[in-house]
Design a protein with these regions (language model features):
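Histidine-anchored nucleotide/phosphate-binding helix
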Residues: 19-26, 113-123
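Internal catalytic-core helix/loop-beta-alpha segment
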Residues: 59-110
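Short acidic-hydrophobic, aromatic-tinged amphipathic segments that line or gate anion-handling sites
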Residues: 77-78, 156-158
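Short phosphate-binding/catalytic loops that engage adenosine nucleotides
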Residues: 124, 155
Length: 158
């Protein structure tokens, strides 16, 4: 997921966009975007109660894939939670050998780590990688903590 504006946007998030554009524009494989997508009732959900910052409300600014990445959109999967539990099924549906998976985006410490853990659990023998130069966390410290946690479960950090 890449959106660097909106209520959860940051300069650190905006700074990764050129790296992500370079990566996806030259990537020879399937690119799947997962996108945080909440409804108008967000503040009445468990996440809204624990993270009371209205963000990624469907069809509002901050929910869209940023303009710089729109030319490279192949597949977008909206998910109402931190991780996309359908991601393993979606990856398998392409009929390709799911032996190498690389993730990047926002937020390292929320969505990226959740999706990395989901795909690593679903494909334990796959090479799961996260490009740290194409990720940003809520804070630099939480970004690093997430990278360290992923490394501990054999997710390769680039």
């Amino acid at each position: 997921m890449i959106c660097f504006y909106g209520s959860l946007g940051s300069a650190h998030a905006a700074a990764i966009v050129p790296n992500v554009v370079k990566k996806v524009s030259s990537f020879d494989g399937t690119v799947i975007y997962t996108r945080d997508a909440h409804g108008a009732d967000y503040m009445h959900t468990q996440e809204g109660e624990k993270l009371p910052i209205i963000h990624c409300i469907k069809d509002t600014p901050g929910w869209e894939i940023c303009d710089e990445l729109k030319p490279y959109v192949q597949t977008v999967v909206d998910n109402p939670a931190f991780g996309c539990v359908d991601l393993p099924r979606i990856l398998s549906s392409y009929g390709e050998d799911v032996s190498r998976i690389e993730l990047c985006g926002l937020c390292t410490d929320i969505c990226v780590i959740s999706n990395a853990m989901i795909v690593k659990a679903a494909f334990p023998e796959a090479q799961v990688k996260v490009d740290s130069s194409c990720c940003a966390g809520v804070t630099k410290e939480s970004h690093q903590t997430a990278l360290d946690a992923m490394k501990a479960v054999q997710i390769e950090i680039l």
